[in-house]
Swiss-Prot record:
One of its GO terms (biological process) is spermatogenesis. The chain crosses the membrane at residues 26-46, 55-75, 100-120, 140-160, 198-217, 238-258, 272-292. PANTHER family: OLFACTORY RECEPTOR (PTHR48001). This is Olfactory receptor 7C1. It comes from Homo sapiens.
Length: 320
């Protein structure tokens, strides 16, 4: 790349959704509503699982971690975007940009790995039901989640640290609403070969592990279900995996959509819309997917809300 006019970045300009003030106001209301729904939905899932002993099982343990990852994944970018729209100040500091890259990559990778772990959990539940509690013991569940966290943090840290070696040109505009790593690399004047190698290697390894794990799990699940003679047992087995399969399809479908939109057209607006689907819509829908058709989860949420209402009533009565 060109080496002239290099500088150490102090701040970047997030162009985001360039629109009139009226449209910006509408976007602020829309994104704030989506964020509040996402935050509340995932927080309720976590609280319901923690407060209900009936949900202290491997499946719900992984689900609570997924909800936490989704909550943090969205919180990494959306609050800053809302602040930028509200104040009309679209600048982000260099340190803030690196922080966004690190946490966005960490929680995105964690989402990916947790979905793979949950696919393995469903495989054991359907294909080895009699040995489920022995195989999916608390020690293994803890190690799977801890391993997912470690891989996510280490991979993200490596990608973020490679950005520190870069010098940037005078053009500091990012055509996005957050510090997307690939967009930041495009602004660098110094050589980004090492950065690209790290990104594509990490993405490739993670993609192969996740795709292989999920594909193998559901390959075995489908063949196990087809061998079941009872229609009722078949339906129960399918319903056990339905929510997870829906979330997997939504997660990878929107992620693949972001990639295709970036590769097919240079339009930043198309990429922005695809990124909103990936960073906001998917985490917002996950709590609904896991709770609407899950009787145990709906009961736990009902008990949680009942206790909250009762507690609020006691406080109100005490103050009056």
């Amino acid at each position: 790349m060109e080496t002239g006019n290099q500088t150490h970045a102090q701040e970047f300009l997030l162009l985001g959704f360039s629109a009139t003030s009226e449209i910006q106001f509408i976007l602020f209301g829309l994104f704030l509503s989506m964020y509040l729904v996402t935050f509340t939905g995932n927080l309720l899932i976590i609280l319901a699982i923690c407060s209900d002993s009936h949900l202290h099982t491997p499946m719900y343990f992984f689900l609570s971690n997924l909800s936490f990852a989704d909550l943090c994944f969205t919180s990494t970018t959306v609050p800053k975007m809302l602040l930028n729209i509200l104040t009309q100040n679209k600048f982000i500091t260099y340190a803030g940009c690196l922080s966004q890259i690190f946490f966005f990559t960490s929680f995105g990778c964690l989402d990916n790995l947790l979905l793979t772990v949950m696919a393995y959990d469903r495989f054991v539940a359907v294909c080895h039901p009699l040995h489920y509690t022995v195989i999916m013991n608390p020690q293994l569940c803890g190690l799977l989640v801890l391993g997912s966290w470690c891989i996510s943090v280490m991979g993200s840290l490596l990608e973020t640290l490679t950005v520190l070696r870069l010098s940037f040109c005078t053009e500091m505009e990012i055509p996005h609403f957050f510090c997307d790593l690939l967009e930041v690399l495009k602004l660098a004047c110094s050589d980004t070969f090492i950065n690209n190698v790290v990104i594509y290697f990490a993405t490739g390894v993670l993609g192969v592990i996740s795709f292989t794990g999920i594909f193998f799990s559901y390959y075995k699940i489908v063949f196990s279900i087809l061998r079941i003679s009872s229609a009722g047992r078949k339906h129960k087995a399918f319903s056990t995996c339905g929510s997870h399969l829906s979330v997997v399809t939504l997660f990878y479908g929107t992620g693949f959509g972001v990639y295709l939109s970036s590769a097919a057209t240079p339009s930043s607006r198309t990429s922005l819309v695809a990124s909103v689907m990936y960073t906001m819509v998917t985490p917002m829908l996950n709590p609904f997917i896991y709770s609407l058709r899950n009787t145990d989860m709906k009961r736990a949420l009902g008990r949680l809300l009942s206790r909250a209402t009762f507690f609020n009533g006691d406080i109100t009565a005490g103050l009056s």
